[in-house]
């Protein structure tokens, strides 16, 4: 488990086990949580320039999050079920919803098996240009081009 995963899990468990979460007023505790994710894939081999890394988590991290959320007794539910609970004002149990934005292939390759292992539904919001290959992933190309340079000369004009 990575340091980031360990810290996140430890923070959630510390709040829960210490009871510190109970000091906040009920109006702030919420009835559920929605995790909005983008990419789930193994950590890249490079340590260079990677501004898009903040939109990525590793499969191990996702597994740790699902394990922790389940240990905190959240129901892992679909977006439809979360909507139903909110409409019916069913707040007896907290819920967690997971969404994947954009529809990267790694959602299927790396995230789906982990969600299946935890029996956790998830919703993929698919960018229309992903399936047919018409979406220009310019931000990934720009990142790779900059990372490949030993120096970058930029002049503001």
Name each model feature, range by range.
Residues 1-98, 105-157:
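Terminal accessory/targeting
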